[in-house]
Amino acid sequence: MRSLQIHVIIPDNSFNIFHHIYQVSPTIEPLKINSQKIKRAFDKCVKPGKGSGPDNLSARGLKLDDYAVAFGFSYVMEESLKSSSYPSQWKLSKVRAVPKKGNSSERGDFRPISLLNIPSKVYEGVIGETIDCHFIDGGISSQSQWGFKSGRSTEFLMLHLTEAWRQELDKNRTVGILFIDFKKAFDSICHKTMALKLQASGISGNLYNLIIDYLSGRKQYVEIEGLRLTEAEVRFGVPQGSILGPKLFSIYVNDLPEVPSSGNLEMFADDTTFSVLFWRLSGWCLCKYSI
């Protein structure tokens, strides 16, 4: 089987390409902090056994008295919300290199994992709950996105696609399929375009300002065998290993299925499948010379 790799560079003003189809959605409800939200986020995001972030606070230690910890978190979050400023200490990531398989001395055989401060994940969980209520429960999220949603899985997507293709093949039609893999999709997000996508999806007010500040001024450092290297600024993408990262990515690509003038596009996170139906390939190429 032959494969084709296509590299596409998206310009900073790429939002303008989709503006005619990506209409502004109803405005989101203002973000509010309360003990119930913090406790839900704490239970969901703090998992004993997970690695600690730059502050070295362990999940197991925080779980020992989660009510007292949640109360302390509430003060920090409320002050952060008032100023629309994400705590700078929570914008730092610790990166470690983990072998892909066994022991290796080759640089390419390692993959980086990013460790965030656990309190930041709790705060992200509170913010993410508000985004989900607006974006998913409000029906704004594209039905073609199968990732990051409760009740949806790769198995359901595969069944959906293969059944649709089978029905067309039974009609003696031809199915053309293009499997698209976005290289470093989460790391390549342009923050300027992300801001425009947030506005178009109805995210405004203190939540919008907080997310923009959350993305800006982030830093990371590499840790090797306990040795901490120099911090570096992160100017693109959403934080790896974060709670908000997948949600922001979903907003970023939410209008992608509406871009092709023909065919069908389905996504599971950044894995994308584009399919077209036709009787004869030559005829389809003449009629649909561009997608």
Language model: regions and residue ranges:
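Surface-exposed loop/turn segments and immediately adjacent short secondary-structure elements
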Residues: M1-G108, S114, V122, R228, ...
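Hydrophobic (often cysteine-bearing) scaffold residues that line and stabilize catalytic clefts
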Residues: N34, P54, S58, D65, ...
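Mobile genetic element proteins and their domesticated derivatives, centered on retroelements
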Residues: L4, I38, G53, F73, ...
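Conserved polymerase palm-domain catalytic core
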Residues: F182-A269, L277, L281
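Conserved catalytic palm subdomain of right-hand nucleotidyl-transferase polymerases, strongest
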Residues: P48-L57, V95, E106-L115, F156-L196
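Short helix-interrupting loop/turn segments at helix-coil junctions
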Residues: I6-F15, P48-S52, F71, S83-S88, ...
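Conserved pre-motif C helix in the palm subdomain of viral-like polymerases
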Residues: G108-G139, F156-T162, K183, R235-S262
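Inter-domain linker/hinge segments that demarcate the starts of reverse transcriptase
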Residues: S35-V46, G72-S80, V126-I131, E155-E168, ...
